């Protein structure tokens, strides 16, 4: 009888814990509201988001899916922006702190871009500074670029993240953060660890751009404001708890 009671009690604890975690997803605490945080994804609808190539949210079959409080780009055989395509916030942002949870599948590639202006005729994917989302162990992009600057949490093709010990395994939720200060100081964070920082618009930043694939774009990453973008790179990647506050 005691063992049955223990099992039942444990099951009840797990159920309560799971319900509590689910209730906290895509919500703001009173403290966060007071601090000026706003949800960019409400967990139920595509409100506040649109296609990077159209004024409406993409309706492609097997594209962006909203289910159980999670926004997922579904797999389309690794083709970059060839199915649903990238999505961007309707609003534009300058100085801000952006938080987001992401979950990779094996070999997946995606990205969270910022200061996206949508003015460049860039082909598949819209142009902007990118917090790289990647399965470094499997996806070949991790070995391209320079000194690992295309790996997870890096400033894509520009600066490598120092994330040793901060990464949770593929299939688990990780938390990313991008902080852009009014003085153009930028930081990338992963699971509570600062993994890189740089000064946007600085001579050092512009030297990094000159050595990258972004050098073809005039004043790359230097817009005063831009959209936040979630990338469709043809692999299944999920997002939730996307929130922002402006400085």
Locations of regions flagged by a protein language model:
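Carbohydrate-interacting regions of secretory-pathway proteins
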Residues: 21-247
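Bacterial N-terminal signal peptides that target proteins for export
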Residues: 1-9
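Intrinsically disordered, low-complexity regions
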Residues: 2, 13, 22-25
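Bacterial N-terminal signal peptides
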Residues: 8-17
């Amino acid at each position: 009888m005691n063992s049955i009671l223990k099992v039942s009690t444990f099951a009840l604890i797990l159920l309560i814990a799971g319900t509590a975690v689910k209730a906290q997803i895509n919500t703001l605490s009173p403290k966060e509201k007071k601090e000026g945080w706003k949800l960019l994804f409400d967990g139920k609808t595509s409100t506040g988001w649109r296609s990077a190539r159209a004024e409406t949210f993409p309706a492609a079959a097997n594209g962006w899916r909203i289910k159980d409080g999670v926004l997922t780009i579904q797999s389309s055989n690794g083709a970059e922006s060839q199915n649903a395509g990238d999505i961007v916030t309707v609003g534009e942002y300058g100085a801000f702190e952006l938080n987001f949870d992401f979950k990779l599948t094996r070999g997946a590639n995606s990205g969270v871009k910022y200061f996206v202006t949508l003015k460049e005729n860039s082909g598949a994917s819209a142009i902007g500074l990118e917090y790289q989302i990647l399965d470094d162990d499997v996806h070949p992009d991790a070995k391209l670029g320079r000194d690992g600057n295309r790996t997870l949490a890096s400033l894509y093709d520009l600066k490598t993240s120092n994330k040793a010990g901060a990464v949770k395994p593929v299939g688990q939720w990780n938390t990313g953060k991008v902080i852009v200060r009014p003085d153009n100081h930028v930081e990338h964070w992963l699971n509570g660890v600062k993994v890189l920082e740089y000064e946007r618009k600085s001579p050092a930043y512009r030297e990094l751009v000159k050595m990258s694939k972004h050098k073809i774009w005039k004043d790359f990453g230097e817009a005063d404001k831009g959209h936040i973008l979630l990338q469709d790179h043809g692999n299944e990647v999920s997002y939730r708890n996307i929130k922002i506050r402006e400085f």
